[in-house]
Amino acid sequence: MGKISSLPTQLFKCCFCDFLKVKMHIMSSSHLFYLALCLLTFTSSATAGPETLCGAELVDALQFVCGDRGFYFNKPTGYGSSSRRAPQTGIVDECCFRSCDLRRLEMYCAPLKPAKSARSVR
């Protein structure tokens, strides 16, 4: 013998199915495609580990971050620094062999040049 379900359960199932049919009818195939694409990129980026930047990708990232200022491959040192320095790590050590973020990339940007003031000509 079959199991008899209660009237409230049957009404809930019926209303829920009708609700889903209406929602699926309203949602076009392009909406479903974009939703699937968003879910796919979200899940793949959430599972991806830290990435490294090497070669042309590193140069492109530095050009993007630093813009017209330019950049250095080694951290700039101040004037009059001692000749007995500790070995420096460069951007390749920090971003190619290990992963780095935008703040780390910005540390290798050249400083902003002061704006040229207009001279008075006599």
Curated annotation (Swiss-Prot):
Disulfide bridge map: C54-C96, C66-C109, C95-C100
Any one GO MF annotation of this record: growth factor activity
A, as annotated region: 90-110
Propeptide: 119-122
Name of the coding gene: IGF1
Region (C): 78-89
Xref: InterPro entries: IGF-I (IPR022341), Insulin-like (IPR016179), Insulin-like_growth_factor (IPR022350), Insulin-like_sf (IPR036438), Insulin_CS (IPR022353), Insulin_family (IPR022352)
Location(s), subcellular: Secreted
Protein known as: Insulin-like growth factor 1
Sequence segments annotated as region (B): 49-77
Gene Ontology, cellular component aspect: alphav-beta3 integrin-IGF-1-IGF1R complex; exocytic vesicle; extracellular space
Subunit structure: Forms a ternary complex with IGFR1 and ITGAV:ITGB3. Forms a ternary complex with IGFR1 and ITGA6:ITGB4. Forms a ternary complex with IGFBP3 and ALS.
Record-linked CDD domains: IlGF
Gene Ontology BP term (one): negative regulation of release of cytochrome c from mitochondria
Protein family according to the UniProt entry: Belongs to the insulin family.
